[in-house]
Amino acid sequence: MKMDTGTKVRTILFLIAWVNQLLSFDNLEPIPVDETTAQQVYDAVSVLFTIVVTVWTSFKNNYLTLKGRKQREALKKNGLTK
């Protein structure tokens, strides 16, 4: 399956965000933090990052399906996209 660079970047960030979130739920942070305040900040930033990346990937046309790839080709054919 051929994907454009933007789709690849968004998909990778999406996966990183969700893996990080799942690890955070199980208290398996890559960098152990002992201070309570630092942990709360980390959790808040982690949730915010996950929400932002999820919204970004949801609303951006990623052309992942066959229909989406056909739409991208039609847009390119008619000069309506980069």
UniProtKB/Swiss-Prot annotation:
Transmembrane region positions?
9-25, 41-57
Q: Name one GO cellular component term.
A: membrane
Q: Where in the cell is it found?
A: Host cell inner membrane
Q: Name one GO biological process term.
A: killing of cells of another organism
Topological domain, Periplasmic: which ranges?
Answer: 26-40
Q: Which residues lie on this side of the membrane: Cytoplasmic?
A: 1-8, 58-82
Which Pfam family is an annotated match for this chain, by its short name? Answer: Holin_SPP1
Is this entry keyworded Nucleotidyltransferase?
no
Signal sequence residues: none
Q: Does the keyword Membrane apply?
A: yes
Give the domain of life. Answer: Viruses
Main localization is host cell
Question: What is the recorded membrane topology of this protein?
Answer: Multi-pass membrane protein
Keywords from UniProt, A to Z, are:
Cytolysis, Host cell inner membrane, Host cell lysis by virus, Host cell membrane, Host membrane, Membrane, Transmembrane, Transmembrane helix, Viral release from host cell
Q: What is this protein called?
A: Putative antiholin
Q: Whose protein is this, by species? A: Bacillus phage SPP1 (Bacteriophage SPP1)
Lineage here is: Viruses, Duplodnaviria, Heunggongvirae, Uroviricota, Caudoviricetes
